[in-house]
Regions:
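Amphipathic alpha-helical segments used for helix-helix packing
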Residues: 100-125, 172-177
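Amphipathic alpha-helical packing segments from all-alpha helical-bundle domains
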Residues: 87, 98-99, 107, 121-147, ...
């Protein structure tokens, strides 16, 4: 696949291509994923695939962008800014941990790390559409909570990054190194609660 910077993100076949690419990338990784396999999984011709994504890197970045955007929007839709801060943060922590330890989240992370030297734009795209987008949403919520007197934070961006890092404690590390591959809802909830309590010990009022 050659280079391209513009991707048309519309149509049923486009959605088929994304679904097929997601399946193949998750199974074979970025380097191992072939155009033939992606086209077959998507149920489209190679010509159709090329018409959307002349570059495999663009396709991977679009899959990552699409999935991260979907998760971010779903999480945002469930947040009730009028609810108690502890409840909102517990929900956010569970969502973050669930994504980080999911097969998709782990595979995307591993692919970005593996391809970091050759294709640094892969990691950049994932960061911008995943962690960075999520932290921006957290920072906006923290600002609202501070205005309501529920939190006391000077640096919203730093606090958002700290909260995200607290959510990585224990389970994500185990998942990344292959020490544990499945996590119960109770484990995720407990890890989330501990992250929230630690965060509130620093920033709660």
């Amino acid at each position: 696949m050659g280079d391209a910077t513009h991707v048309v993100r519309t149509g049923r076949k486009f959605e088929q291509v994304l679904a097929g690419a997601r399946e193949v990338f998750m199974a074979d990784g970025f380097e191992g994923a072939s155009v033939d396999d992606i086209a077959r999984a998507a149920g489209v011709s190679k010509a159709t695939l090329y018409s959307y994504f002349p570059d495999k890197r663009l396709l991977f970045m679009e899959v990552a962008r699409h999935e991260c955007h979907r998760m971010s929007e779903e999480t945002a839709a469930r947040i009730d800014s009028a609810a108690p801060v502890r409840d909102v943060l517990n929900m956010a922590a569970v969502e973050i941990i669930t994504f980080l330890t999911s097969g998709f989240g782990l595979q995307i992370y591993r692919i970005c790390v593996a391809e970091a030297e050759r294709f640094p734009e892969l990691g950049q795209a994932f960061y911008q559409n995943g962690p960075e987008r999520g932290r921006e949403r957290l920072a906006r919520y923290f600002r609202q909570a501070c205005e309501a007197g529920d939190l006391a934070i000077d640096d919203m961006t730093m606090a958002a990054e700290q909260f995200s890092e607290l959510c990585k404690c224990r389970l994500w590390t185990r998942a990344v190194f292959g020490l544990q591959t499945e996590f119960t809802a109770e484990e995720i909830a407990y890890t989330g609660r501990e992250a929230v309590e630690t965060f509130l010990a620093r920033y709660g009022t």
